[in-house]
Amino acid sequence: MQIIDLGCIPYAEAVEIQTGRVQEVAAGAENTLYLLEHPKVITFGRNGGRENLHVDDSTLASMGIEVAQTTRGGNITCHFPGQLVAYPVFRIAGRPGGMRALFYSLEEVVIRTLARFGLQAFRSEGRPGVWIENRKICSIGIAMRRWTSYHGLALNVCRDVSLFDMITLCGLTDARATSLQAECNDDSITLQEVKDVCAGEFRAVFAHPPVAAHQNSV
């Protein structure tokens, strides 16, 4: 696995990079993990989400917030500086469990990353992503083309998650967003620090995928 740090780039640019790499990985190139941030953008998944947006597009545009329809699974979510985004462009063909196992492994990466900061996070049946009690700290939405994954996860690191106030998070009225800094009550934790830990956990998890990922995918 090669890991590439893209810095903070627009959403559309990241999609273009991923789709280009999908073709290469599907043809035999090395699996690639992109780590990055996005400027403020609200995205909709294949399950919809515009009905869960509480602000019109013109108001968002005046605030410098983009809106984008995507090919990933899931509903509505937000991206912004201070949120760690990870896009795994990985071959799925031949992997035990396929996409469901990949999803489980992505959750595992985040759970282990948060544990390194002293936080106990968990999966919630029927509520994709990673949670701390009823607070969502990480959204996950993936897609597949030519048996290769793209899109991925978004882990809230910095305390300010106010962009989520403009949406019903993933269409769940009882859910609210949280962040690593807020849960640790420590604003000194940097995104780079979390990025480094997350990269290490990606390598560990995908070197030895969790058994439950295979069991849950059949």
Curated annotation (Swiss-Prot):
EC category: transferase
Subcellular location: Cytoplasm
Domain of life: Bacteria
Residues noted as binding substrate in the record, renumbered to the chain: R72, G73, G74, N75, I76, T77, C78, H79, S139, I140, G141, G152, L153, A154
UniProt xrefs under InterPro entries: aa-tRNA-synth_II/BPL/LPL, BPL_LPL_catalytic, Octanoyltransferase, Octanoyltransferase_CS
Annotated transmembrane regions: none
Domain spans labelled BPL/LPL catalytic: 27-210
Pfam families for this protein: LplA-B_cat
Example of a GO MF term: lipoyl(octanoyl) transferase activity
Main subcellular location of this protein, as a coarse class: cytoplasm
Family matches, as PANTHER family: LIPOYLTRANSFERASE 2, MITOCHONDRIAL-RELATED, OCTANOYLTRANSFERASE
Name the record gives this protein: Octanoyltransferase
Gene label: lipB
